[in-house]
Amino acid sequence: MQRALRLMEAVASHSSGAPAKQLAREARLPLATTYHLLRTLAHEGYATRLPDGFWVLGERVESLHGRSRTQQLLARLRPALVALRDELGAAAYFGMHVDDEIRLIDIADGPRAPRVDLWVGFEDAAHATAMGKCVLSQFDDERRRDYLSRHPLVDLTPHTITEPGRLMRSLSSSTGLLLDREEYALGTGCAAVPVTDATGSVRGALAVSCRPGKLPKIERAASQMRATAERIQRTLTLHS
């Protein structure tokens, strides 16, 4: 394992690739061992031999790098979610607008702050979730109508807003706080605030869920949610 890692480090140090003999010298490995390891790495997708005989990192390394960056980013974001959960006694959620979809990224819940039953994916329920409505509220009318034209307003509970005009009117908020009053799941209410970038463009939303009767308390904590959203915004700006 150590020899393979040393060899991969040697390959990674050459942006245009390098021949096996050079890699063997730099990794301090016998040439026969180097060839064996390179063949194994190539078979698994971690190294690629170019037509000129030079070796470069394979596609699976790029995939791992992307996953690693995502994990590191989530590790930096999670303390903010956990702190908000503990402050409000409610499960906290972070979602992002990625590839024109609204995706749930992370949840901080616990025995005293249970998460909502995610029985329908957030990608298909933006109209019924505080998080989804919060992101939609940051779109201009044209972009919002385009999104809704591709995502039917499915009736999830008796409280779900399925009439486009009414939904559009519900997306205005003087405080930036958007609510879901049992529109996604009966017995659960949610509140969300937007997370933007430095230019003010929406990146996602921060949300909390609770019993419907607790929503007034959550509404009064809008400033705490906005402060957490700003903390998340700074983290995204610095590390993504």
Predicted feature locations:
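An N-terminal domain-start capping segment
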Residues: 1-15, 81-104, 227-240
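Juxtadomain coupling helices with adjacent low-complexity linkers
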Residues: 164-168, 186, 202-240
